[in-house]
Amino acid sequence: MFALADINSFYASCEKVFRPNLRNEPVIVLSNNDGCVIARSPEAKALGIRMGQPWFQVRQMRLEKKIHVFSSNYALYHSMSQRVMAVLESLSPAVEPYSIDEMFIDLRGINHCISPEFFGHQLREQVKSWTGLTMGEGIAPTKTLAKSAQWATKQWPQFSGVVALTAENRNR
């Protein structure tokens, strides 16, 4: 079994971790030259701001909707990614970075001790506790299916951020 952990709205969430006053506020992060939107908090997504949208199209909306805007801070994002990796590595036998905000976790053999779904929820809780970041986790027999299951965590909130494609969940 494999899990794919993906931090939710990673760049925007990193900005919020160190600014508690931004909780539940719309946040966007701009590209290197501040030319376009590269990250959005859920609140900013709800306002209709699109990924890749040019800054000049959002500038006026920033004032009207009280959107908090940040230039990208890659040192912060790298540091937070390393923190998440450290948490996952402390609880998992093998972790493989997939991108700055996604990691594959090798869960082979874990089902002999604990259900993969329960373990996924434990990982989510620990990452949230130690870093302040939330993540979705897809769990499946292959990495490709784990990636698909992770996508499903964003579509099906009733699974509380963990979708496990296991035999036990086949009819769920």
Residue ranges with predicted function:
Residues 1-172:
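Nucleic-acid-contacting surfaces of polymerase cores and analogous helical-repeat interfaces
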